[in-house]
């Protein structure tokens, strides 16, 4: 599989939903496979909260492959012998696209930090569309994304009707609910409460080296909602860390050790400000904003919508995706709904690929 990483730089302003602008700005992306002569074999991959453009394959020195490697590649569900796959890093993220830690002016040593404008899912999608236009791509075979990536897929369908043959949102919602907004708020405040966050004026190199307890705590909060109680039970039970005494005040169960380790590792590769800004974008997501009603928003969709949810998702509940199906039926849209039986939790879209990869394969073959 041919893999390339590129950065597209733009000097024309990116006008944001808030009324503010980014100028100049850039977006980093990864491609897999070969673009055909007609440029009609393109699939766009959109990532979740802490994801990146590196969705598949491995580079020299990588510890593990891209986050959807089991789905993308030669002979896989998203077959790179047939399709040219583009995976972008969203505006606001910390892997190479314009973000809070980007220079506030070209050549400046001053970074945006908290002066960075609030970005929305709509802004992320607008940036992706500008990228595709710059590549001469006028139509997509499919857009596939899970969680926040599914929000981007839905937003694309509403904002650019007819641009894509198949829209495949996975484990997502049409409107972030108060429960998730509350979770996101808890994570944001955990970061802000850490004195080493310094109101966004931290040294990123020091954070990568020493970590940030507030971001680690935020990540632990997140894990409680990405993995189901049954999965925690299966993986850890009530086992205690062998080196810890059971009656030590800070002695740990295995599950506590797991949360501590993953929380501590997270700041070494993900930026605290990017985490805050992307959480805010997720909280703000509402597909009906700018429209008279939800029905009005969904009536804009002219493409085939294929919804994939998981029965045990406790972040974006399957009922929310069933609501999308109901709205699409009301407005006479083309929509399929698949509910996967799983008790793993929200992160099923990352770890249980074998339960839905064949659905994506069939969609791309035109068999659904």
UniProtKB/Swiss-Prot annotation:
One BP term from GO: homoserine metabolic process
Q: Which top-level enzyme class is recorded in the Swiss-Prot or TrEMBL entry?
A: transferase
Q: Where is the AB hydrolase-1 domain?
A: 41-352
Q: Where in the cell? A: Cytoplasm
Question: What reaction gets catalysed by this protein?
Answer: L-homoserine + acetyl-CoA = O-acetyl-L-homoserine + CoA
Task: List the pathway annotation.
Answer: Amino-acid biosynthesis; L-methionine biosynthesis via de novo pathway; O-acetyl-L-homoserine from L-homoserine: step 1/1
- A Gene Ontology molecular-function term? homoserine O-acetyltransferase activity
Assembly and binders: Homodimer.
NCBIfam families linked to this entry: homoserO_Ac_trn, PRK00175.1
Q: Which PANTHER family match?
A: HOMOSERINE O-ACETYLTRANSFERASE
This chain's protein is named Homoserine O-acetyltransferase
């Amino acid at each position: 599989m041919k893999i390339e990483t590129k950065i597209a730089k733009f000097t024309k302003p990116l006008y944001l939903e808030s009324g503010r602008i980014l100028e100049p700005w850039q977006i980093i992306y990864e491609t897999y496979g070969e673009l055909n002569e007609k440029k009609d074999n393109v699939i766009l991959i959109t990532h979740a909260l802490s994801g990146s453009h590196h969705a598949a394959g491995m580079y020299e020195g990588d510890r593990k492959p891209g986050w959807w490697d089991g789905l993308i590649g030669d002979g896989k569900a998203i077959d790179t012998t047939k399709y040219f796959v583009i995976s972008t890093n969203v505006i606001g993220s910390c892997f190479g696209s314009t973000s809070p830690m980007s220079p506030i002016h070209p050549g400046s040593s001053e970074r945006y930090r908290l002066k960075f404008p609030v970005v929305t899912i709509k802004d992320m999608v607008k940036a992706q569309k500008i990228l595709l236009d710059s590549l001469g791509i006028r139509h997509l075979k499919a857009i596939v994304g899970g969680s926040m990536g599914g929000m981007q897929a839905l937003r694309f369908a509403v904002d650019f009707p007819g641009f894509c043959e198949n829209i495949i949102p996975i484990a997502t919602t049409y409107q972030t609910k108060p429960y998730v907004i509350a979770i996101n708020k808890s994570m944001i405040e955990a970061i802000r409460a850490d004195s080493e966050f310094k109101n966004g004026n931290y040294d990123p190199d020091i954070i990568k080296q020493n970590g940030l307890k507030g971001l680690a705590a935020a990540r632990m909060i997140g894990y409680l909602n990405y993995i189901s109680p049954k999965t925690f039970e299966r993986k850890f039970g009530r086992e205690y860390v062998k080196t810890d005494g059971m009656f030590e005040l800070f002695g740990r169960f295995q599950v506590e050790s797991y949360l501590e380790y993953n929380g501590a590792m997270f700041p070494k590769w993900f930026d605290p400000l990017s985490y805050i800004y992307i959480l805010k974008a997720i909280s703000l997501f509402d597909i009906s904003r700018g429209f008279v009603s939800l029905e009005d928003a969904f009536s804009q969709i002219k493409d085939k919508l294929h919804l994939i949810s998981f029965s045990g998702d406790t972040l974006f509940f399957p009922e929310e995706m069933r609501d999308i199906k109901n709205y699409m039926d009301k407005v006479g849209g083309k929509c399929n709904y698949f509910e996967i039986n799983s008790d793993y939790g929200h992160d099923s879209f990352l770890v249980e690929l074998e339960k839905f990869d064949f659905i994506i394969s069939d969609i791309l073959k035109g068999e659904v």
